[in-house]
């Protein structure tokens, strides 16, 4: 009902819930609140700023979600929901929260042109194979698109990325992506940020004309 501001931890966990309409007053959803339910889609209202760990985790039926623009804390919110495919972001979103889609089943993502920052581990251990980072993005968080060897060797992994020259701050965003071979560097690059391609499978890269600086550990542990 309208007026509810918080849904507690494990409130509906393991139930047969297939559909839920969340009130516009809701600001916080607790850990495991809807985990292992039968939800097919979820629209998070603009008011939601905090989602606990695995609040929507391990939901085999969940395929679509709408993310509000003010969501700031949501680490591991969809972890284990392996059939999550369709992501819609509310207009005006500027940051994709830390760990938001970590360990979920998404295989493709369209990042809105309003986004300037992608958070720590936001897409770690997902199934994304090709990635286009829009020109608006200046910061990629640590391990934002990384992949862990002990997570699952059977999952598809990143093979191609297209990056804007506006990137200023990165920290091993693609670490562990050993199948990453194709990199497109768009725009007028002056600096290759620190750690950008560390721990990747990149074997060949043409450094653009105009680059005057390569940051520390930019290619550390890669296949170059």
Predicted regions and their residues:
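Structural signature of tandem-repeat unit edges
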Residues: 1-6, 15-28, 37-50, 60-72, ...
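Consensus positions within tandem repeat domains that build extended binding/scaffold surfaces
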Residues: 8-11, 30-33, 52-57, 75-78, ...
